[in-house]
């Protein structure tokens, strides 16, 4: 970006009535979370599961059809412990918060890491869900969504101690069926409160000075980039 372009961008941000932050996996990669990478960090996060199931990256690990629920939840707990429960705000997130300042804002993201919420940016629409939430595998639409942060930490600790059993598998409070992560797929339950809040935000600022701050979104992105053009 040239100095002239940077000055114009700063002026737009200063003059904005509100800021819409749109973000995809490029931002996550900048923070050190790369769903597509086959590197040393993959084994650091997933441990023995990498060789056991020949997992080439985190994305494959998340969608792999495990032969048992214990290994599925071992995988989930290890990923969420590393990238979620142990998350420390990055320089990128600090900069985003600084740019937003006291202005009205909303975040529209396809990232599943929940990092925006973890740093306090809770005016948020997670269009593909996040890996802290679970839904009933038998009645995903009818039964409530479960927030699993503490449960996943418990699973992680038992996994590390070698004491994890079938009794520790997260289950639906309403029917006792196993849970599944509430992320993109046929059972995904989009957060309707987030949808409504996002619609309200857009309607409120559609005729005002609304700046779109696009972060890490590829040119072919159809979920966020295309509809926001």
Where are these regions (language model features)?
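Conserved catalytic alpha/beta core of Sir2/sirtuin-type deacylases, generalized to analogous enzyme cores
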Residues: 1-229
């Amino acid at each position: 970006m040239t100095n002239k372009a940077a000055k114009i961008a700063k002026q737009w941000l200063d003059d904005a009535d509100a800021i819409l932050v749109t973000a995809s996996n490029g931002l996550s990669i900048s923070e050190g979370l790369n769903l597509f990478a086959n590197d040393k960090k993959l084994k650091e996060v997933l441990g023995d599961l990498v060789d056991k199931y020949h997992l080439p990256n985190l994305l494959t690990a998340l969608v792999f059809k495990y032969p048992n629920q214990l290994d599925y939840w071992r995988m989930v707990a290890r990923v969420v412990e590393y990238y979620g429960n142990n998350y420390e705000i990055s320089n990128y997130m600090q900069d985003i918060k600084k740019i937003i300042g006291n202005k009205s804002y909303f975040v529209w993201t396809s990232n599943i890491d929940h990092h925006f919420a973890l740093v306090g940016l809770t005016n948020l629409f997670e269009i593909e869900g996040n890996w802290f939430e679970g839904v009933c595998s038998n009645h995903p639409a009818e039964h409530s969504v479960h927030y699993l942060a503490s449960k996943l930490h418990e699973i992680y600790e038992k996994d590390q101690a070698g004491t994890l059993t079938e009794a520790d598998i997260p289950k639906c409070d309403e029917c006792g069926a196993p849970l599944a992560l509430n992320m993109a797929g046929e059972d995904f339950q989009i957060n309707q409160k987030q949808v409504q809040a996002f619609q309200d935000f857009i309607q409120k600022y559609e005729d005002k000075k609304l700046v779109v701050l696009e972060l890490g979104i590829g040119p072919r992105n159809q979920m966020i980039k295309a509809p926001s053009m």
